[in-house]
Amino acid sequence: ERKLAVLLGIPLNGVDPSLNHIGTKSGSRKAFKEAGVSLPFGFEDLRTDGEIADSLYDMKRRDPGLRRAVVKLNESFSGEGNALYRYPEEFSRAAIRDQMHHLQLSIPKETPEVYLDKFSRMGGIVEEFMDANEKTSPSAQLRISPSGQVMVISTHDQLLGGATGQIFL
């Protein structure tokens, strides 16, 4: 898109490819931190099973009352790249690692092994699972023009459902 826009001398109405990383789960967490935006405690730029397990362990050590965490693929949307992790009763690195094979996946026919393989290729994040009796999931779509003008395209509250309650319906 960028090369074509330059060749034709027209504005690029899309993301410059050099900025694509900001749109990933890891990139978004980093951008939010830099901007001082509150976000769930967690870790980004993870790739391996070991990094996921270490992050889950560190989160539980930081908050012994933590019961669940969410693992998210970097390049996913509509909640389909999210998996819920339930902490085992035993608090040990081995127990936490073993429990990873029991991830509750958003896509019913996928297995934890397939999910973790995708994670190793794509990377992702692990963060504390935020739960409440009443859940909302506001969404906004904005457009930034080539001149830097920001325009709100739409806003809405997303309906969530599916096996993990994280799929946008």
Where are these predicted regions, by residue range?
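Catalytic micro-motifs at enzyme active sites that drive phosphoryl/nucleotidyl and oxygen chemistry
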Residues: E1, G124-F129
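ATP-binding N-terminal substructure of ATP-dependent carboxylate-amine bond-forming enzymes
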Residues: E1-G23, K30
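Short, well-ordered alpha-helical microsegments
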Residues: E1-R2, I52, K135-S137
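Short acidic, glycine/serine/threonine-rich loops at helix termini
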Residues: L4-L7, E80-R86, P138, T164-F168
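Glycine- and acidic
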Residues: I10-V15, L39-G42, G123-G124, T164-L169
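Beta-sheet entry/capping signal
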Residues: P11, R67-V70, G81-N82, G123-G124, ...
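Active-site nucleotide/adenylate-binding loops and adjacent lid/helix of ATP-dependent enzymes
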Residues: L19-G123
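ATP-dependent carboxylate/phosphate-activation module, predominantly the ATP-grasp catalytic core
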Residues: F91-E110, E128, N133, L142-L169
